[in-house]
């Protein structure tokens, strides 16, 4: 399925000597050693969890899930990304070593999904935060579609030139390194009347006759039982 035609093996001489470049050699070595950082926030991640089983066996592609961004070169975002989670996602992406890749999985990750119309806290597309290499639509995508997306990413890596990639990432970044988000006008300010919602009662406000009335109504046999 989606066989990868790598140019490294096309330039062979009559003496069976492979002539290639260092860039092509590094791309070839990364094809079967993608270590993903799983960033699952919603139901789309359940479909990706099916790949771990023996039916699909994503280990055959060299995928080794990592829990640390410093050991991963692929981050797979699956699910809804909220405004509160956006800085942490950008921080995880920046902690990953170069070269690094991103797969946006699911409609909620790509466009905000069903939350994009009336939700005040949903990011309308993860590509507004980090650059995306492969878009995987669906609600949710099937495991076969995830395998196809990984294969397409491997094809992209095989034809990649690293200096061109870093230059395009710098030009297409939507936020600066400091990630200072512009806070717009809020529909609801949230300034509630705290005195109306919460009125703590102290023991000094309870009349003495009320206190002794309820205390005398409880008999000793009831306390024993």
UniProtKB/Swiss-Prot annotation:
InterPro entries: NADH_UbQ_OxRdtase-like_20kDa, NADH_UQ_OxRdtase_20Kd_su. The keyword ATP-binding does not apply. Its EC number is 7.1.1.-. GO terms for cellular component: chloroplast thylakoid membrane. Binds 1 [4Fe-4S] cluster. One of its GO terms (biological process) is photosynthesis, light reaction. It catalyses: a plastoquinone + NADH + (n+1) H(+)(in) = a plastoquinol + NAD(+) + n H(+)(out); a plastoquinone + NADPH + (n+1) H(+)(in) = a plastoquinol + NADP(+) + n H(+)(out). It is found in: Plastid, Chloroplast thylakoid membrane. Its cofactor is [4Fe-4S] cluster. It holds the Pfam family Oxidored_q6. Keywords: 4Fe-4S, Chloroplast, Iron, Iron-sulfur, Membrane, Metal-binding, NAD, NADP, Plastid, Plastoquinone, Quinone, Thylakoid, Translocase, Transport. It is a peripheral membrane protein. One of its GO terms (molecular function) is 4 iron, 4 sulfur cluster binding. The keyword Disulfide bond does not apply. Its main location: plastid. [4Fe-4S] cluster binds at residues 43-44, 108, 139. It comes from the Eukaryota. NDH shuttles electrons from NAD(P)H:plastoquinone, via FMN and iron-sulfur (Fe-S) centers, to quinones in the photosynthetic chain and possibly in a chloroplast respiratory chain. The immediate electron acceptor for the enzyme in this species is believed to be plastoquinone. Couples the redox reaction to proton translocation, and thus conserves the redox energy in a proton gradient. NDH is composed of at least 16 different subunits, 5 of which are encoded in the nucleus. Belongs to the complex I 20 kDa subunit family. This is NAD(P)H-quinone oxidoreductase subunit K, chloroplastic. The gene is ndhK.
